[in-house]
Amino acid sequence: EIVIAGTDNPNVPGYLANAKETFKHVPQLNFTGYVKEVEVAPLFTESAVVVFPYTSTTGSSGVLHQAGSYGRAVVMPNLGDLANLILHEGYKGEFFEPNSIPSLAEAIRTIVSNDVYRIELGEANYKAATAFPMERVTAIYLKEFQNIIKTKKAAKKEGF
């Protein structure tokens, strides 16, 4: 089964409706639309691989962190914040070249045809996603906010 989860990118309205119509003849292709919070866990736990068919990114991918927290292998474009997360935070996956259908297909095939590799990627992603417990993430944010406040107070004292 192939599941297309989520809604249109605001920059490309109608994309999913068009894809659904174009590929309506493909068996076992399901479009979920908006995914409610209670449906997130089953969606990930029942998936062998999570694919990010993005051609551009803006900001860190929460979906990558979610996929990692469920121990899932990922396929993603070799660009922006996704590539940085692989490089700096310990996530692992198969890259594809954005806008290249053959590259995307090859990346998916590489994972789904090799169970050992797929499991290895999922384990690495779980480790990366759980490396920083929420308490530690919260403490890092609070410290950073305190530093910002301290800097602003010091600048205000100096008349800036």
Residue ranges and their predicted role:
Residues 1-17, 33-34:
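Glycosyltransferase donor-sugar binding loop
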Residues 16-38:
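Nucleotide-activated donor-binding/catalytic signature segment of Leloir-type glycosyltransferases, i.e.
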Residues 36-47, 65, 69:
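Short acidic alpha-helix that forms the nucleotide-activated donor recognition element
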Residues 43-59, 72:
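Acidic donor-binding loop of glycosyltransferase active sites
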Residues 55, 72, 76-86, 98-99:
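Short glycine-rich donor-binding/catalytic loop of glycosyltransferases
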Residues 88-101, 110-115, 130:
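Conserved acidic donor-binding segment of nucleotide-sugar-dependent glycosyltransferases
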Residues 110, 134-160:
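C-terminal alpha-helical cap of glycosyltransferases
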Residues 110, 117-131, 143, 147:
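A short, well-ordered alpha-helix in the C-terminal region of glycosyltransferases
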